[in-house]
Each structure stands twice: as C-alpha cells, then as structure tokens.
C-alpha cells in the first residue's frame, strides 16, 4: 500500500522551506510500518522547472537526502504545487530508481506519484520503448509520466493545444487497473491534476477569505441517455496512440454544476468509494470497463492553500 500527498499554495507566499515542511508533515501523517521508501517533487530555482528527491528507508532518510542539496529554503513562491509519496515495493524491488515520484524524461516535464496497479503497463512500456523512451525503473508507475509526455508531444505535432485536464483524460483512457495519482508538469506550472479509479482521494481547501467553489457531479448510467462517451476522438486516427478506437458501454451523465461558498476554515472534500460500488451492476461495470474520475477544483478570485 502506497500513500500520496500533494500541497498547493495559490497567491499565498510561502518559502521553499515552509513548502517542504508541509509536504514532509503530510508524508508523516501517511506513515505506516510497511513502507520502505519515500520521495518528493517541488519546483526548482528556475521558472517551470521541477526537482525530484527520493530515497529508500524512512522519511528521515528523505529529509537527509534533501539537505544534501543545500537548497535555498528561503526562496519565496507566490504559487507552488508539490507532490510526495511513500512506497511499499510491489512492482520492482527496493532500490532508489523504483522510488516515486517518477518522471517522463531527464528534464522532468511530467512528474507522477501513484497508488495502485496498472495492469497493462507491460504493453504500454513496450509501445513507449519502441518510441524511444528509456525506462529507469522496474515499476508500473513509470509508464504514466512517459505516456503523458508522448501524448502531449504528439498532440503538439498534430496542432492541438491541450490543457492539463484534457491531456489527463487522454492518458487515463489508456490505463487499465486501479490508481490514485497526482501529476505536475513544467508545461502547466502552478497546476496539479488528481485522478482516481478505485482509490479514494481527499481534497482540503483552506483560505483567509470566502471562496466560491464549483464542481461537477457525475453518475454512471446503466442505459445510454444524455451521456458523454469516454472514447473521445481526435481529428487524426481517433487515438493519439494510433490504436483502434475503443467502444465503451459505460455512460456518463453530467448533473448541473452546483456551487457553494467555503467559510473561513478548513474544509475537506471526500471522494468516496460508494460512487463506484453502489450496487452489483455498477461493480460489474467497474470491473469490466473501468470508471474514470478526474478531480478538477476551480477556485474563483481567491487565495488558498
């Protein structure tokens, strides 16, 4: 069992030291006796750069690893997104290369932390290796950031300018198995994408002023009505991986987007498992076709963390 944690501050100045401390505290809250490594990704000194630090052993070993780099912990960030991970070795043994976060390439264009199992990772890895990607680990997770980069680069070549949310949907469409994941990217600074399939996620928002929050509720239908099919097509071959289009019977209905105001205190948003396992028929749908749930929290005219 792995643990993932992310922290974002928007329009609230925090020093790098404060950000690292918050991320480490989040990791410590996820500590349990069987984890064997941990890692962290934060913004670098240069704009749109991401740094990764990871180490086997306890979280104290990760803190020692970070200290070796003599980072400027007084460097301020008006906005910043950082992600962290504790790992128990499953795919791949206990070695530093297998620790999370995993990256898409040496420049860390896409960085991912992940809890779950990608069951088709061998096929994805073979495809990506054929495209020239070099894998450093034995994990199933590493295929995710490299898939992000492959789809992103391909979309640019095809003339598409995808936002982070649309790009994530294209990536998730290719993944089989279960996941709770966080992804950051140098192409989308000050943004983080959270997605889950079978693994609950919790989002907490804290601000000094009231905030308007909008979100979209989704319900998976047994019949095809007022739905958005999950196999979104592109103008080229229908799939940026040039594979045959996949047909899903799973249907998605969007309810009217509710909105509400968050008072001046911490609120937690629980993405519960009941959405997937409400009854046996939906359980079969989840097992057969998979259910995607991408979290997108839109905060209007607010400063928050």
UniProtKB/Swiss-Prot annotation:
Pathway: Nucleotide-sugar biosynthesis; UDP-N-acetyl-alpha-D-glucosamine biosynthesis; alpha-D-glucosamine 6-phosphate from D-fructose 6-phosphate: step 1/1. It comes from the Eukaryota. Its EC number is 2.6.1.16. One of its GO terms (molecular function) is glutamine-fructose-6-phosphate transaminase (isomerizing) activity. Pfam families: GATase_6. PROSITE patterns: GATASE_TYPE_2. Gene3D superfamilies: Glutamine Phosphoribosylpyrophosphate, subunit 1, domain 1. The keyword Protein transport does not apply. The keyword Transferase applies. Signal peptide: none annotated. Residues 2-305 form the Glutamine amidotransferase type-2 domain. The active site is at residue 2. SUPFAM superfamilies: N-terminal nucleophile aminohydrolases (Ntn hydrolases). It catalyses: D-fructose 6-phosphate + L-glutamine = D-glucosamine 6-phosphate + L-glutamate. It is an enzyme of class 2 (transferase). Keywords: Aminotransferase, Glutamine amidotransferase, Transferase. GO terms for biological process: fructose 6-phosphate metabolic process; protein N-linked glycosylation; UDP-N-acetylglucosamine biosynthetic process. Involved in amino sugar synthesis (formation of chitin, supplies the amino sugars of asparagine-linked oligosaccharides of glycoproteins). PANTHER family: GLUCOSAMINE--FRUCTOSE-6-PHOSPHATE AMINOTRANSFERASE, ISOMERIZING, GLUTAMINE--FRUCTOSE-6-PHOSPHATE TRANSAMINASE (ISOMERIZING). This is Putative glutamine--fructose-6-phosphate aminotransferase [isomerizing]. It comes from Saccharomyces cerevisiae (strain Lalvin EC1118 / Prise de mousse).
